Amino acid sequence: VKQGVYYGWKDRDFQKQENQIGTIKLEHDLTDNLTLSNTAVYNKSKNDYLWTNPDDSKGNIYKNGNVWARVNSRVADTDTFTDQLALTGKFNTGRLKHSFNLGAEYSDQETDRTQYIINGDNTTGNKYQNCTPADSISSGWCTSVQNPNRGPWTGSISTEGADRYNIENENTSIYFLDSIEFSPQWILDLGLRWDDYSAKQTMTYGARNSAVLGNSTTPPTAKAGDKVAIKNDSDFINYQVGLVYKPVENGSIYASYATSSNPVGVDGGDGSEGITAAIQNLKPEEVKTYEIGTKWDVLNEKLNLTAAIFRTEKTNTRATTDEGTTQNIGETRVDGIELGVNGNITDKWAVSAGYTYLDSELVDGGYEEITPSTTPKTYRPNSNNGNQVQNVAKNSATLWTTYQVMPQLTFGAGAIAMDKVYANAANTKYVPGYVRYDAMARYNVNKNVD
């Protein structure tokens, strides 16, 4: 396919975004070693788009040389309020020096979203995804993969009749961090956090929903305006511990262990699945990370070198059981290495580079239904167990460097490289690796113009 080929309509497809942020921060020094602060942030955003995504999930390119012009669209209005109250300070217990942060956070996010109906039909055009019969071509839902035939857009787009969603996410948390210095060479970092999280999604049926329309064999099961609400409430505790050893002033070696949680519905406001009836009562997914690393400042502390090895284990992931239900039984694992360089090699030459290696594995994907189906349905351990985790590249690297030729003139160049990533758990579909090159030149005319 030639570079620059576009399968949508340039006079139809669009994206509009708005973002308004207001921040108020108050800070008061209670003593020389004790500070109380409060930061409140209000964010109002809008994301309104409709674009075309060429989709060949049905193999049309090989069947008839066409591609399905699937539509992605969203109209989302999001209001977010966050408030953080923190008490930071220093104190000593005998010979131990403490630097602590005690705080509480509250956040509330509400999103109202819908999507566009195309030609009064549906939101994506999925009934044309096989690019047959011929009306899928004439109506514009399919087009030639090599020479897309796109005249002016003559159809209609409207949110009338589309389903509407209201997503509310609320979180209250309390945390405590303490960095304890035993000596200039040894430092212990401790952290504890409690979260109370709730997610609620209310879906209002639109007139174009298939459950409202029914078909020749299935009568309608809902009416336009009907509402379905699902909710998940969970609370969880996470913690971290890290030990730092500084053999010299400009170098350190550390080991750390940390946990985190991914509750149901945490991504609902992003337009993804978020929360569904099948998972609304499940527990949060749990993540454990083990890491050993080192950091060094060299060349008179102008250049920072870092290296780390780590393991991340994600348990309690949502997977299908041998009874066909969804439960917290899955597990994935990633072993990795990170190397980094950042800073100045000389006064005029700066560099930022990094390399990451990730060995990922689907340890337990639950169960899958045996195909062809049996009656009653029977399940077997997931055949994808042992595969590379989708959307995780084994190798990735970045490089950016600049050189100041003269006080006013600087040149820069760099590259970003990414290994192939699999698009499905079966590791049968993938996006190939790539390298992207960048370059720049900057000239400072004066302190106000460059």
Over which residues does each language-model region extend?
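Acidic/polar loop-and-plug regions of large Gram-negative outer-membrane beta-barrel proteins
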Residues: V1-D29, K44-T78, T123-N171, N316-T317
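Transmembrane beta-barrel architecture of outer-membrane proteins
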Residues: Q17-I21, T78-A86, N169-Y175, I187, ...
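Residues on the lipid-exposed face of transmembrane beta-strands in outer-membrane beta-barrel proteins
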Residues: G22-H28, D83-G89, I174-I180, V241-Y245, ...
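Membrane-embedded beta-barrel scaffold of Gram-negative outer-membrane proteins
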Residues: K25, D29, T35-V41, S45-W51, ...
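Structural signature of Gram-negative outer-membrane beta-barrels, strongest in the C-terminal barrel
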Residues: T78, K97-S99, E105-Q109, Y165-K314, ...
